[in-house]
Regions:
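Terminal, low-structured helical/coil segments at or just beyond the last alpha-helical repeat
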Residues: 149-150, 157-161, 165-217
Length: 217
């Protein structure tokens, strides 16, 4: 009898607990945030699932497309990365987010188009990002919030490479100079004569050196 009353008491306590507990459902923001945790841990297939769920929950959730784009990049599906980024660029910023998601998307588009050898598009998106961050009142930089080793200097070196591929050596040299000044503000101007084959070869070698230096930093 006592055993039966104990079971009945436990049963009623469980009913009260279930009735009182507030139901919690993951939002698109929760899903994207967890996707970024997985991304930062290198779990790209899993992060893909969470970012996909995020935009299924809300087709206008910008950071979900942003996460998908960067994840596709890690999975070396660059065409899909571009598509995700381009969709994300049309979506509104989440007012609760501190970081400007459009900046991350523009950087992602710059890197993806450069890897695809779409140099004109890489220049378009990269120049757009550099212009936007230079309008900042404070520090005129960009750092990818989910990997601090990726920043505006990587955008500059990508632009230097794409401008070189487009035979615009003056612009290419300008981006190289911006990187060198950022790394050492006291350094003298780095000048080469890009009207000569020797000068262009020197510029190409410097771009390659800076790419390797930034990757190793």
């Amino acid at each position: 009898m006592k055993h039966s009353r104990l079971l009945l008491s436990i049963f009623f306590l469980l009913l009260i607990f279930v009735a009182c507990r507030k139901q919690w459902n993951a939002t698109e923001e929760d899903m994207a945030n967890y996707g970024w945790i997985l991304y930062e841990e290198g779990e790209y297939l899993e992060s893909y699932e969470w970012f996909s769920n995020s935009i299924r929950e809300d087709l206008d959730y910008q950071d979900g497309y942003n996460g998908l784009g960067w994840t596709y990049g890690k999975l070396v599906d660059l065409d899909s990365a571009v598509q995700a980024f381009e969709k994300g660029l049309t979506k509104p910023q989440n007012p609760r987010m501190v970081d400007i998601v459009a900046h991350d998307i523009l950087a992602g588009l710059t890197f993806a188009h450069s890897a695809l050898k779409n140099d004109s598009s890489a220049v378009h998106y990269g120049d757009s990002l550099i212009w936007l961050i230079e309008q900042n009142d404070g520090e005129k930089t960009w750092v990818f919030p989910h990997d601090s080793t990726t920043n505006y200097l990587d955008v500059h070196v990508t632009l230097a490479l794409s401008y070189y591929a487009l035979s615009d050596f003056t612009e290419s040299l300008g981006h190289v100079q911006k990187i060198k000044t950022a790394l050492n503000p006291a350094s003298p101007p780095w000048l080469v004569n890009t009207n000569t084959i020797v000068g262009r070869n020197q510029l190409a070698a410097e771009i390659e050196y800076l790419q390797n230096y930034l990757q190793d930093s």
